[in-house]
């Protein structure tokens, strides 16, 4: 079988996107090796390490020349989504190189969506337009897990295979594959780290993005399940952005309502950065855990304003999503239904370690 390598590091066998097992979830762990002292300093000065999660491209099965993959994301703004798009674009380049496609025969992709994931109607309108153009495959990150039913049915009726990435939809029977972070694990990780920091006791709040988004539901579910193991911790508030008119005002009100708040978990990058921007009392010692290691959160960790970050590998997610979409267009190729990437904990002890660079935005 002819294969073209796209990563210099050892490829984890679990990443392979061939071989469908309906209902089974494949979890992919990177397990970065810790480097300390002189070794870490030396590697930090070198070029960013390549992502070990990127699979090889199997060229033994034909892809139709000129295939176009349409991507409709729930958001197109922010460092996380920039990384997702970069991974997708690099996957397209790697496929064209591996198959030796000329410019005229090249596989292409489009990346569209709203600039705010709360703009669900904008995403639906974009989906309608994209499906009408009859792409070879559709990749979707759903801003509202219940909102895309009609569009998914239309795609199915027109023979357009669908890969959902990042945030799933309610009716998964209409989806060929799902590629995402293990968001329940992300929530569990946040709960575990927060409980450890508080010695298993104290009042906490959860400040969250949209409740109607599947990835957020999974993070909250994992967090609640894990935090319940700490009898001394009380969850005083869970506030969803789509449940209030002004999220910033709602967070301020929660802090005033609970002056004894000991900890906070923010479920995505936007909410994390919004919380960091709030004016707090000088003597505030609330332990904060955020999501997705953006520039602002990295600085907050270094400054001691944030304990740490549960972060994802958006580049790998984007890369694998495109390869999966193209696999769904191949005849006779079975594709794993569900494949989840492990999140990683980022704090002051590993932020400068190149082994974790794919989780730093």
Language-model regions: role of each:
Residues 48-64, 123, 178-204, 247-248, ...:
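Hydrophobic alpha-helical segments within soluble ligand-binding/sensing domains
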Residues 1-68, 131, 153-160:
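Short, low-complexity disordered leader/linker segments with a strong preference
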Residues 34-65, 215, 226-230, 316-361:
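Hinge/cleft segment of the Venus flytrap/periplasmic-binding protein
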Residues 73-85, 106-122, 144, 179-189, ...:
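Hinge/beta->alpha junction and helix N-cap segments in small-molecule ligand-binding domains
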Residues 130-133, 137-157, 223, 236, ...:
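Hydrophobic alpha-helical
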Residues 145-185, 203, 294-302, 306-307, ...:
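Flexible loop/hinge segments that line or gate small-molecule binding clefts
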Residues 89-109, 229-231:
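Signal peptide-proximal N-terminal region
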Residues 262-263, 269-272, 276-315, 321-342, ...:
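Exported/periplasmic ABC-transporter solute-binding proteins
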């Amino acid at each position: 079988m002819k294969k073209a390598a796209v990563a210099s590091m050892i490829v984890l066998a679990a990443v392979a996107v061939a071989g469908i097992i309906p209902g089974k979830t494949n979890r992919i762990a990177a397990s970065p090796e810790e480097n300390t002292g002189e070794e870490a300093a030396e590697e930090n000065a070198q070029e960013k390490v390549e992502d070990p999660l990127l699979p090889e491209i199997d060229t033994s099965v034909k892809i139709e020349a000129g295939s176009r993959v349409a991507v409709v994301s729930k958001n197109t703004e922010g460092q996380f989504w920039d990384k997702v798009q970069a991974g997708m674009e690099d996957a397209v380049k790697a496929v064209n190189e591996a198959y030796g496609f000329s410019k005229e025969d090249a596989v292409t992709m489009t990346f569209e969506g709203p600039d705010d994931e709360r703009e669900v109607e904008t995403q639906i309108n974009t989906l309608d337009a994209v499906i009408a153009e009859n792409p070879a495959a559709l990749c979707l990150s759903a801003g509202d897990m219940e909102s895309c039913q009609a569009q998914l049915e239309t795609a199915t009726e027109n023979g357009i295979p669908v890969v959902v990435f990042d945030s799933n939809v309610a009716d998964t029977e209409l989806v060929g594959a799902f590629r995402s972070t293990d968001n329940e694990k992300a929530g569990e990780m946040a709960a575990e780290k927060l409980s450890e920091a508080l010695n298993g006791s104290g009042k906490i709040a959860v400040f969250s993005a949209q409740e109607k988004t599947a990835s957020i539901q999974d993070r909250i579910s994992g967090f609640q399940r894990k935090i319940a193991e700490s009898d001394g911790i009380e969850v005083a508030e869970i506030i969803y952005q789509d449940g209030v008119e002004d999220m910033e005002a709602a967070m301020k009100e929660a802090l005033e309502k609970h002056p004894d708040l000991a900890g906070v978990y923010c479920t995505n990058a936007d909410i994390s950065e919004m919380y960091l921007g709030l004016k707090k009392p000088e003597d505030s010692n609330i332990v904060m855990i955020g999501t997705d290691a953006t520039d602002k959160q990295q600085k907050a960790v270094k400054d001691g304003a944030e304990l740490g970050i549960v972060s994802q590998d958006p580049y790998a997610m984007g890369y694998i999503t495109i390869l999966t979409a193209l696999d769904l267009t191949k005849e006779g190729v079975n594709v794993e239904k569900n494949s989840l990437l492990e999140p990683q904990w980022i704090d002051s002890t590993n932020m400068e370690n190149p082994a974790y660079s794919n989780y730093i935005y």
